[in-house]
Structure formats: structure tokens, C-alpha cells
Amino acid sequence: MNFVPDSNIAHNCLCKGAFSQYSRAYVITNEDLRYSLQFMPKETNRALTVVGSGDHPLFASLYGAKHVDTFDISYNAKCIMDIKVAALQSGLDLFDYEQMLYELFYCRDITGLKNIDKIYEKLPSVEYKYLCDMKKVSLFHQGANPQLYSRFLPNKREYGRLKDIVQKPYTFVLSDIKDLGAKITKTYDFVHVSNIFDYVPRDKSFDVLSSLLKLVNPNGRILVHNQMVWSGPSCRKIAETFNNWRHIKEKDNINILERIR
């Protein structure tokens, strides 16, 4: 990723509170990834997933994706993802990992957190400098109290497995969903966009979703959460418009598109 964060711009964006490249990140997902990822193809070699809280790529690896690339509109999402990967690599136990996330949600100066030195030494230098420059600003105070979502964290067995399989940071693309299809040239067996389409204007939903189709290999899938009503119709319209796609699930706020050839 060629993006170089600017702490002055980040301060201004966070003060305004609008969606931006520096929007605050969640520390724990509120999505049941154990449920969602049962719909990932069993032989997934390559997956592309939104970062969110960093849990999406971790669980994609846990559920069998051999190579995982990531994207998000916010650089702070990359930061929380890399912090989690660094925690795994530095040998934090599950209790300390959970406590770190709860503290990240509430604190402004993360340089004083327990175990943070172990984390910092494993982060990219540019990211380390950014976090130090932003140490008086809350970067991860997003959403509700993360302890409400503790059930979505890895359990002891899953956490131990992640320590074994996550050996390096995930590749990251900083991008709005509407530009993602133009920025990525690789193709994938599974693309997980979660609930991003809740934030795409209704009249743009079909076009934006269509732009992602070229990222998917034959027999691959796109998973879309549809808490808002319009992503479901857009998924059905994709299947009606493109004869190499089918809409195979619309249940529990999940839509799945599958490329059949």
C-alpha cells in the first residue's frame, strides 16, 4: 500500500466526525463471522474481505482461506488489523488480547497500554509513527461497548490456531467500495463485503455491486449483508442481468451471489 498517513489531516477528519480515510475503527466485529463464513467455498485459495475491526481477515484465515487480501475506507481499520496480527505474533495470551481490545476502545493514549511495546515493534514503521503522532486521539472508539460483542472474539481453540496460521500482516488496499473494482487486478474465490452496501446510495447499489463481479473466479462467491432493504434486490438483479451468476441465498440478512462459470 502506497498511502502515507498524515496525522494533521487525520486530526481534522476525526474532529469533524465524517466518513473519511481516517474514520474511527471498531475493535470487535458485531457480525457473527462463524455463521457468515460457513458460506465461503470450501476450497478457497484466495479471499478478499473488508477489514472492519480486523476480525474478518482473521476468521477468513481460520475458516480455511489460504491467502487473504483486505480493503477498507479507513486507515485506522488497517491499524487495528495490524495490531491484532502483531498481538498474535508477539505471543499474547487470549486474556491479554481481549483486555487490550477493551482498553483500546476507551483510551486516548495507547502508548501506555500493557503489552503495547510488544505490538509496536512488529508494526510497519510508517504505521508506528502514525500511532505515536495520534496518541492523544481516540482511534478505535467506534460503536457500542465492545464487551457486548465478546462472543464474536476467537475462543481459546480458535485463538491458538490463529497464532499458528497468521504469520505475517495482510495485504491492504485503502479504498471506498465504489472504487474497489478499479483498484484491484487480482481475482478471488470469495469476496466478503459485509454490510458496506448499507452505506451505498440505493440508486448506486446495482452499479457498485456489478463493478465487483470481475474480481470473482468461476465457482466463487460474493457475500453481502443487507440490513438495508436495497442490497437484496440488487443481488437478484445481478442474477437476472448476468447469465453466469446466480443468487443462492437471501436469509438472515445475508445475500450470496455465486459465479457459475
Each PLM stretch: what is its role?
Residues 236-261:
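Core SAM-dependent methyltransferase catalytic element
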Residues 1-43, 116:
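S-adenosyl-L-methionine
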